[in-house]
Amino acid sequence: MKKILWSFVILFSIPLCSVAQTDTIAGKTHQLREVTISKDRHQRALQSTAPMHVLNRRDMLTMGVTDMADALHRLPGITLRDYGGAGGMKTVSVRGFGAKHTGVSYDGVMLSECQSGEIDLSRYSLDNVDNLTLTVGDNADIFIPARNATTPATLTIQTLRQPSDDLQPHMTAQLKAGSFGYISPFLRYEQCLSNRFSFSAVGEYVYAENDYPYTIKNGVETINDRRNNSRMNSGHAELNFLWNTSSTSQLGGKVYYYDNGRQLPGQVFYYSNTSRESLRDRNFFGQLTFQKRWSEHLSVKWLAKYNWAASLYDDGVVAGWVQDGDYYQREAYTSLAVLYAPDSHWVFDYSVDYAYNNLNSTLPTDTRPYRNTVIQSATAKFHTGRLTVMGRLLYSLYLNGACDGDGAEDMRRLSPSLSLSFELLPQLHLRASYKEIFRAPTFNENYFFHYGSKDLKAENTQQLNAGVTYAGKLSHNTDLTATADLYYNKVTDMIQGVPHNMFVWTCMNIGKAEILGLDVTAKAAHTMGRHTLTAAVNYSMQRARNHTNPESPFYDNQLAYMPLHSGAGSLGWENPWVNISISGHAIGERWSTNEHQNSTHINGYSEVGATIWRRFHIGRPVAEVRFDVKNLFDKQYEIVRNYPMPGRSWQLTINMKF
C-alpha cells in the first residue's frame, strides 16, 4: 500500500502546466481537426533525426501488401517471428533487440502486455489501418506520452481518420475469401453529426481452417501431410469519436474489443503432427485523449486508458492438466504532456505517465503480482536553418509487489538520448542518434513458477545510429527517395532461461549481445500520362552476436532467429485497365538456438507474390476488386523451427465504399 501511495505522491507532486499543439517546431502548420500535420509524413520521415520508415495506405495497395506480416517485411531492420497461417502468432524484433524491446502504439497510445511483454501483431488487420510507421530511436514528434519513448523501437499503427465535414453517412463493406477456408467480412460506418462531432464504428470477423499442406524430407523419404488443429475464429470491433469542443481543444475516444478462439498447431516432427491445444484471447480497452491549445506557445495533452486482457489456455490432452491455465491482466494508465514553444527555434516537452498493472491466473502457484510505474520525460528540440537537434532525459520508476508473496525488486533509472539532423543539400540530409533505454522484467520472467526469478535486474540497451537520406527528382516525372543507416547496438544483463537442474529452468541476467548492422531503402516512381511505375526495395544486414562468455564455444555466434541478410522488394504498374504488382522478400539462414547445432539450423528462403486490382464506379459507390496470389512458386519454408509456413495460396477481396 505504501508503494501505491508513493506512486501517487510522485505523480501529482510534479508541477502541472498547460500546453499547445505544436508537436515539433514552429513553421510546421498544425490543425486540431483530426490532429493532422500539413507536412507530408514521408517527407518528415526523411528529415527526422532518427530512422523513421512509413507505409501509408496507398503504399500498401500499390506494393501488393496483403496482411500485417507482409507489411512488416517491407520495413527494414525487422525480424518477424511467424508460427504460420492466418491464426499464427506474429511478433517482431527490430535490429536484433528482441520482441520485448519493440513497442507498439495504436492511435497514439502504447499497447500493453505485462505478462509476456510481446505484442501479437496477428490480431491487427490492415483493413482499418491508414499507415504504419517504424521509428528506431526517438520520435520526431516530441509531443507524446513518456511511455512512447521507453523502447528502442516503436511500431505505430494509425487507423483510418474520421470522416470529412459533409455530414453524410459513409460506409465501407468488404469481403475477403481465400485458400484453406479463409473468409473475412469487414464493415466500417462513419459520419459527421455536426461540424464539431464525428464518429466511426468498425466490425470485422475472420475464420480460417488453416489446414494447408506441407512436406518433410527425412533423408530419401518424403512425407506429405496437412496442418491440423489450426482453426481460428476471430472477431474485432471498435468505436471511435472525435469532438472539437472549441476552436482550440479536442476530445477523442476509442472503445476496442477483440476475441479470438483458436486451436494451436504443435511442432511438426517426422511421423508426428498431433496437437490438441487451444487458446482463447480476449482484449478490451477504452481510451480518451484531450488536447488543448492555450496560446500560440503553450499546449497540453492528456490521455487515460483502461485495458483488460484474458488468455485461456487448454492443453487438450488430459482434462485439468497442470499446464492448463487462465490468465487475466489489467492496466489503468494516464499521461499528461505539456508543450512549450517560446520562439521559432526552440520547443520543449514535459510528459509524465502513471500505470498500474496486475496479473492473476487459475494456477495454484499464482502470487497475483502487481506493478506501479511512473515515467517522466523532459525533451528539448532546437531547429535553425539546416540543423535540428533533439535531446531527451527519461526517468523510469517501477514499484513491484505481489498479493500472495514477495514482490520483485523495485527499479529506477535515468535514460538519456540525443539525435540530430543536418541538411547538407536541399535533397540530402545527414542524421545521427544515440539512445539508452532499459527493459524491466515481465511478470512471467519475475513470477512464473520455477521459471521466474524475483532477483532479476533490468536489461540495458544502447543504440548508436548514423545515416543519410535523399529525396529528389531524377527527371520531371521520376521521383526517388533513399535512406542508408549504419548502427551499433549493445544489450547487457540480457534475461535468459538457463537450466537450474535436469528438469527446471530459471531466468537469470547472464546475456550480452552486440549488433552491427546496415539498413538501406529506396523507392522510385515514374509517371507517364495515365501510367505510373513504382519500385521499392529494402535491405538489412544484422551481425547480431552472442558476447556473453568469451570462454564459451558459442561465443560470437549469431543470435537465435536473427538472419545476417534480409530484404524485400516490389514493382507496381498502375494503368487504365488492371493494376499489377509483383513483390517478394528473402531471409538468410538462421539458427533456433545460440549454440548453432546442426539440428537447429533453419534454411534461408525467398517468397514471391502477385496482385492485380481495379477500382471503378458503380453509380455513386466506388468498388475495388483485388486478387492476390501468395507464395507464387509454392516454396516450402519455416520461420520458426518445426512450424511450416503455407505454400501457394490465393485471396480475393471485394470492397465497396458508399
Where are these regions (language model features)?
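A beta-strand signature from Gram-negative outer-membrane beta-barrel systems
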Residues: 126-172
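Gram-negative outer-membrane beta-barrel transporters
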Residues: 344, 482-490, 509-593
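Membrane-embedded beta-barrel scaffold of Gram-negative outer-membrane proteins
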Residues: 301-313, 431, 458-516, 521-525
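Structural signature of Gram-negative outer-membrane beta-barrels, strongest in the C-terminal barrel
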Residues: 341-489
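N-terminal periplasmic "start-of-domain" segments of outer-membrane beta-barrel proteins
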Residues: 31-61
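C-terminal beta-signal and adjacent terminal beta-strands/loops
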Residues: 586-593, 601-603, 612-658
